[in-house]
């Protein structure tokens, strides 16, 4: 197993997919650096991990701020001497029709879903290039693969993540940096994403969908662990993951 003793940063780690991934990777022996804005939730997750003899620290992090991302990577290197992988998982999904003109929410999605990923990449890339190894994993969405009414801006941000990660993979191969990438496209996974939707009609429709088909975040955690656990000369770069019963 290649996860044991790997130093792994997780953003958006305070709930949902991030929390589930942290718990699973800790069980497999990873050394974790957890990041999110909600410190009280991070504290509880770290306590849970340590109670099971796992190893984890946390840092309050706003992924929209470049300096926060840089400090996060610096913390990991200061504490553990290196970073082996980063899981860029922070995101929001305030879906609504374009005609609702929720421009502030559009901007928030762009800042967190796109710039947050870019900031994470920029923060970790120098150390990965220097050590000629590293693994960058990002959460996109099936919304980045298939359009649907109400998901225009969210889908656009997740398509951007898809393109960023694919070009990063190509450039890493060309430059010989040995940096691996993986992009995950979840469908209906039961997380707090629905709580970010303020458009009532959209929220009701998405809630009904998730009630019918949604599965637990640990399903995605196992995919992240699988990607990290592959040999260094193998790059499994895309995972589309959803409930068996969901027609999408």
Swiss-Prot record:
Keywords: Oxidoreductase
GO molecular function annotation: oxidoreductase activity
Binding site for NADP(+): 9-33
Enzyme Commission code(s) on record: 1.-.-.-
Active site residues per record: 154
Residues engaged in binding substrate: 141
Domain of life (superkingdom): Bacteria
Family: Belongs to the short-chain dehydrogenases/reductases (SDR) family.
Protein name (database record): Uncharacterized oxidoreductase Lin0452
Highest classification ranks of the organism: Bacteria, Bacillati, Bacillota, Bacilli, Bacillales
């Amino acid at each position: 197993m290649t996860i044991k003793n790997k130093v792994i940063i997780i953003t958006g780690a305070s709930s949902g997919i991030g929390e589930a991934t942290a718990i699973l990777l800790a069980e497999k022996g990873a050394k974790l650096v957890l990041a999110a804005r909600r410190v009280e939730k991070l504290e509880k997750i770290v306590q849970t991990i340590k109670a099971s003899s796992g190893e984890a620290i946390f840092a309050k992090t706003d992924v929209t701020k470049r300096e926060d991302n840089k400090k996060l990577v610096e913390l990991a290197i200061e504490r553990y001497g290196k970073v082996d992988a980063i899981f860029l998982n922070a995101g929001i999904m305030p879906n609504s029709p374009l005609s609702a003109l929720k421009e502030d929410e559009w901007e928030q999605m762009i800042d967190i879903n796109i710039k947050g990923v870019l900031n994470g990449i920029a923060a970790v890339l120098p150390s990965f290039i220097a050590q000629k190894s590293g693994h960058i994993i990002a959460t996109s969405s099936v919304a980045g693969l298939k359009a649907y009414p109400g998901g225009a801006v969210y889908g656009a941000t997740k398509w951007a993540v898809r393109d960023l990660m694919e070009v990063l993979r190509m450039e890493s191969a060309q430059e010989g940096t040995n940096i691996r990438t993986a992009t995950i496209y979840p469908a209906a996974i039961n997380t707090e994403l629905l709580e970010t939707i303020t458009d009532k009609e959209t929220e009701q429709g998405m809630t009904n969908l998730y009630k019918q088909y949604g599965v637990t975040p640990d399903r995605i955690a196992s995919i992240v662990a699988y990607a990290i656990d592959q040999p260094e000369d193998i790059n499994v770069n895309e995972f589309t993951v959803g409930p068996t019963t969901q027609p999408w």
